[in-house]
Regions:
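Short, conserved SAM-binding/catalytic segment
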Residues: 107, 126-134
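Core catalytic lobe of class I
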Residues: 1-124
Length: 134
């Protein structure tokens, strides 16, 4: 399976760095926009003008279930800009964590799948998708 790299987006977590006792506290995360086919997003749908540049700055709320949580607004904004492509659009989250991205994809009626190496997070993601966690 091959993908075309479209853009890298940087999420500046502001004052909410991910907890990582093994390295300097990371306060940014990278988002890679990859597509299999050409895709023309509608940036006018973005919930905020802060989300149309390549650096997004907003804080995450602490989550005791995961050391690097992010709010639903992050995947929501991306999916709002491409939501017309529901028939062939698939969301893949290679680091699914507690399932936030998958939950948002499900709410948009998009096809989705995720990968997660940590079995506890897999369980939490399933609970998120089944509506029993959050």
């Amino acid at each position: 399976m091959s993908f075309t790299f479209r853009q890298q987006i940087i999420w500046d977590r502001k004052n909410s760095p991910a907890v990582a006792p093994i390295r300097y506290l990371p306060n940014t995360e990278l988002i890679f926009w990859l597509t299999k086919t050409p895709c023309q997003p509608n940036f006018e749908r973005a919930k905020s003008p802060l989300f149309v540049g390549e650096v997004w700055q907003f804080s995450a709320k602490p989550n005791p279930l995961h050391p690097a949580p992010f709010p639903e607004e992050l995947p929501t904004n991306i999916m709002m800009c491409i939501k017309d492509k529901t028939e062939d659009f698939v969301v893949y989250d290679p680091y699914a964590g507690t399932g936030t991205t998958l939950k948002v994809a499900k709410s948009f009626g998009l096809k989705y799948f995720g990968s997660e190496i940590n079995s506890n997070y897999c369980r939490l993601a399933n609970e998120t998708l089944n509506g029993t966690l959050f």
